[in-house]
C-alpha cells in the first residue's frame, strides 16, 4: 500500500506532501552549497581550489535553490495542497499528470548533480551564457547534462502550469466568479500563466545551445553568423518572468497569513491585489533586457527598459501598502507566521528599493556583476521567497499534519534566521558599492572585513536550518493534536479539520451567493 500510495499517487494532498519533502531536502543541498561558497569567501586566499570548482558550486547552488527548492515548495507543495481545498475541487484537473510533474523532478535533480560529477563540472553560472558554455570553454558532458536537467524541470513546470490553470478556471463551483477565489489561488494562476509563456523560450534557447555544442550549428557563434547576445535575450525573456514566478505564490501566502493574524476576514483591497498581480505578471515580460544593460544596447533601448522596470514598482507598492492596510486596526496575534510575514514585508521592500537603484541603466553599468546585485536578489529571494515559505509552512503545518509546532521554538528560530540572513546579505551591498565583482573565488584584502561578516551570518543561518529540523522532529514526536481553528468561514481550506480527510469535496460544494 505504502509504495503504491507514494509512487503512483494521484491525490493532490499526497503529491503536495511529496513536493514539500523533496523541496526541503533540495533546500538542504542548496544550503550546503551556499555554505561552501561562504567558506571560500570567508577570508582572502584559496580554500576549495580554482575558480572553476567555485563556479560549479555557485551554479549548482542557484539551480538547486530555484528549480528544486523554491518552485517545488511554493507551486508544487502549497499549490497542490491548497488550491483544490480553496476552490472546493475534489482534486486537481489532471491527477495523473500531476504525479508525472513531480516524478520528473528527481531525475532532473540527478542529472544536475551528475553534471557536477563529470569532467570539470558546469562552471557557467545559472545563466549558462555562451561562449563560456560552448564546447571549447566547457568541453565534455557537464553543460549537456545541465541542459537536459533544465529540460526535465521545464517539462515538469509546464505540465504543472497547465494543470493549475485548468483547475483554477474549470473546477471551481459554477456559481463562483474568478473574483471570489482566494488570493493564493490567483497567485498560483498568474504564476502558472507566466511559466507556460516563458519556459518554452528557455527550452528553445538551451536546445540551440545544445546543438551549437554538439551538432556544429552556430546560433550563438559569430563565426557562422550567429550572435551570443541572442542567447541572452532568449534566456532573460524566461529569466525575468522566472523571478516573478518565484515570488508571486509568496505574495499569495503573505496575503492569507497577514489577514489571518490581523484578525481580518479578508485582506485589504482584494481587487487591487488581483490586478496588481496580473500587472506584475504582464510587466514581467517586457523588462528582460535590464539584465543586459552592459551588452551595448542603444541609449533609447536602455531608457525604455529603465522606465518599464520602474513601473513594476507601482503594482508591487500596491501590494505592500495593502498588506499594511490589512494590518491597520487589526487585533494582531503575534504568532510565528505573522513574524515571518512582517519580516517578509520589511525585507522584501528593502530588496525592492535596491532593485529600483539597479533599474537605472547608468547606475547598473557600474553595479552590474558586483555583489550589490547579489545582495539585491538575495534580499527578495532569501528573505522574500524563503520568508513566505516559512510563514506559509508554520501557518499551514497543522492543516497538513494535524500536529502543532512548538511556538516558543519557532519564534526563536525566526529570530536566529532573521539575524543570520541580514548579517549575510546586508554587508554585500557595501562590497558591491566598493566594486567587488561576482563569481570570483578570491578577492583583494580590502574586501576582507565585510566578507568575513557575511560568512559568519551564513553560519548563523545554518544554525537556523538545523533548528528547523529539530522543530519538525519535536512536532512529530510530541504529537500535539489540533483542537479547533478560528475563522474557518473565511478560510475554506480549514473547513474539513486538521488534517483534512484523504478525499475532500467528493460531492460538489454547495455555494450560496450573498445578494446585497
From Swiss-Prot:
Q: Which residues bind Na(+)?
A: 40, 45, 441
The pathway where this protein functions is:
Energy metabolism; oxidative phosphorylation
A cellular component term, taken from the record's GO annotations:
respiratory chain complex IV
- List positions binding Cu cation: 240, 290-291
Which cofactor names does the annotation list?
Answer: heme; Cu cation
Q: Name the positions where O2 binds.
A: 244
Residue location of crosslink 1'-histidyl-3'-tyrosine (His-Tyr): 240-244
One of the GO biological process terms: response to methylmercury
Q: Which InterPro entries does the entry mention?
A: Cyt_c_oxase-like_su1_dom, Cyt_c_oxase-like_su1_sf, Cyt_C_Oxase_1, Cyt_c_Oxase_su1_BS, Cyt_c_oxase_su1_dom
Which sites bind heme a3? 376
Q: Which residues lie on this side of the membrane: Mitochondrial matrix?
A: 1-11, 87-94, 171-182, 262-269, 328-335, 401-406, 479-516
Q: Per its UniProt record, what PROSITE patterns does this chain match? A: COX1, COX1_CUB
- Mitochondrial intermembrane domain ranges by topology: 41-50, 118-140, 213-227, 287-298, 358-370, 434-446
Keywords, sorted A to Z: Calcium, Copper, Electron transport, Heme, Iron, Magnesium, Membrane, Metal-binding, Mitochondrion, Mitochondrion inner membrane, Respiratory chain, Sodium, Translocase, Transmembrane, Transmembrane helix, Transport
Kindly provide the name given to this protein in its UniProt entry: Cytochrome c oxidase subunit 1
Q: Which organism is it from?
A: Danio rerio (Zebrafish)
Amino acid at each position: 500500500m505504502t509504495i503504491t500510495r507514494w509512487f503512483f499517487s494521484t491525490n493532490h494532498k499526497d503529491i503536495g506532501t511529496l513536493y514539500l519533502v523533496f523541496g526541503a531536502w533540495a533546500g538542504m543541498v542548496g544550503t550546503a552549497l551556499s555554505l561552501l561558497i561562504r567558506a571560500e569567501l570567508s577570508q582572502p586566499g584559496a580554500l576549495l581550489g580554482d575558480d572553476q570548482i567555485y563556479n560549479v558550486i555557485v551554479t549548482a547552488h542557484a539551480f538547486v535553490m530555484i528549480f528544486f527548492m523554491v518552485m517545488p515548495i511554493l507551486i508544487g507543495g502549497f499549490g497542490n495542497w491548497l488550491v483544490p481545498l480553496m476552490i472546493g475541487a475534489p482534486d486537481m484537473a489532471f491527477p495523473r499528470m500531476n504525479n508525472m510533474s513531480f516524478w520528473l523532478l528527481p531525475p532532473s535533480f540527478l542529472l544536475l548533480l551528475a553534471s557536477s560529477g563529470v569532467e570539470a563540472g558546469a562552471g557557467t553560472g545559472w545563466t549558462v551564457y555562451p561562449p563560456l558554455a560552448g564546447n571549447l570553454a566547457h568541453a565534455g558532458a557537464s553543460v549537456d547534462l545541465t541542459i537536459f536537467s533544465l529540460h526535465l524541470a521545464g517539462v515538469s513546470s509546464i505540465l504543472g502550469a497547465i494543470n493549475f490553470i485548468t483547475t483554477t478556471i474549470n473546477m471551481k463551483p459554477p456559481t463562483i466568479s474568478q473574483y471570489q477565489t482566494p488570493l493564493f489561488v490567483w497567485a498560483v494562476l498568474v504564476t502558472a500563466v507566466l511559466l507556460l509563456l516563458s519556459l518554452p523560450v528557455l527550452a528553445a534557447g538551451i536546445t540551440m545551445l545544445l546543438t551549437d555544442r554538439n551538432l556544429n550549428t552556430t546560433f550563438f557563434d559569430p563565426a557562422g553568423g550567429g550572435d551570443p547576445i541572442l542567447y541572452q535575450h532568449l534566456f532573460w525573456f524566461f529569466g525575468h518572468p522566472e523571478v516573478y514566478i518565484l515570488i508571486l505564490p509568496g505574495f499569495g501566502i503573505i496575503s492569507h497569513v497577514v489577514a489571518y493574524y490581523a484578525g481580518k476576514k479578508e485582506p485589504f483591497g482584494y481587487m487591487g491585489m488581483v490586478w496588481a498581480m496580473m500587472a506584475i505578471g504582464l510587466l514581467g515580460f517586457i523588462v528582460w533586457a535590464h539584465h543586459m544593460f552592459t551588452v551595448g544596447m542603444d541609449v533609447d533601448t536602455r531608457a525604455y527598459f529603465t522606465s518599464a522596470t520602474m513601473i513594476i514598482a507601482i503594482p508591487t507598492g500596491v501590494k505592500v501598502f495593502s498588506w499594511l492596510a490589512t494590518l491597520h486596526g487589526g487585533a494582531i496575534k503575534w504568532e510565528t507566521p505573522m513574524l515571518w510575514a512582517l519580516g517578509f514585508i520589511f525585507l522584501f521592500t528593502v530588496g525592492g528599493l535596491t532593485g529600483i537603484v539597479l533599474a537605472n541603466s547608468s547606475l547598473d553599468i557600474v553595479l552590474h556583476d558586483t555583489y550589490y546585485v547579489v545582495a539585491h536578489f538575495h534580499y527578495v529571494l532569501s528573505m522574500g521567497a524563503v520568508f513566505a515559505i516559512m510563514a506559509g509552512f508554520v501557518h499551514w503545518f497543522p492543516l497538513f499534519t494535524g500536529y502543532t509546532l512548538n511556538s516558543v521554538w519557532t519564534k526563536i528560530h525566526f529570530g536566529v534566521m532573521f539575524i543570520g540572513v541580514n548579517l549575510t546579505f546586508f554587508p554585500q551591498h557595501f562590497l558591491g558599492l566598493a566594486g567587488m565583482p561576482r563569481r570570483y573565488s578570491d578577492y583583494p584584502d580590502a574586501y576582507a572585513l565585510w566578507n568575513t561578516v557575511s560568512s559568519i551570518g551564513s553560519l548563523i543561518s545554518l544554525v537556523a536550518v538545523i533548528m528547523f529540523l529539530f522543530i519538525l522532529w519535536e512536532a512529530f514526536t510530541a504529537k500535539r493534536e489540533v483542537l479547533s481553528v478560528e475563522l474557518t468561514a473565511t478560510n475554506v481550506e480549514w473547513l474539513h479539520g486538521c488534517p483534512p480527510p484523504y478525499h475532500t469535496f467528493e460531492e460538489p460544494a454547495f455555494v450560496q451567493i450573498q445578494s446585497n
